[in-house]
Amino acid sequence: MKKVIMALGVLAFANALMATDVKALAKSCAACHGVKFEKKALGKSKIVNMMSEAEIEKDLMDFKSGANKNPIMSAQAKKLSDEDIKALAKYIPTLK
């Protein structure tokens, strides 16, 4: 029984370490998009906090894959894991 409890504790700790730090990711976007994603980046982009979770996730995945042609955003999105993208897409709409 002690081994099972120990194993569950180790798994829970490992999972917590691997969790996406979405606030840290969002800070790296703030220079262009604003702290609450309320700005048009470089005066051109959509206002991201006005988008739905699904729209944000799709756009970031498309930037990552190259389907959306924007060299700056493609370079940024390629640094993100799919988990990071999902976490950002869920987090950003809460900043309104």
UniProtKB/Swiss-Prot annotation:
It comes from the Bacteria. The keyword Heme applies. Disulfide bonds: none annotated. Binds 1 heme c group covalently per subunit. GO terms for cellular component: periplasmic space. Pfam families: Cytochrome_CBB3. Its main location: periplasm. GO terms for molecular function: electron transfer activity; heme binding; iron ion binding. Keywords: Electron transport, Heme, Iron, Metal-binding, Periplasm, Signal, Transport. Natural electron acceptor for a formate dehydrogenase. Belongs to the cytochrome c family. This is Cytochrome c-553. The lineage of its organism: Bacteria, Pseudomonadati, Campylobacterota, Epsilonproteobacteria, Campylobacterales.
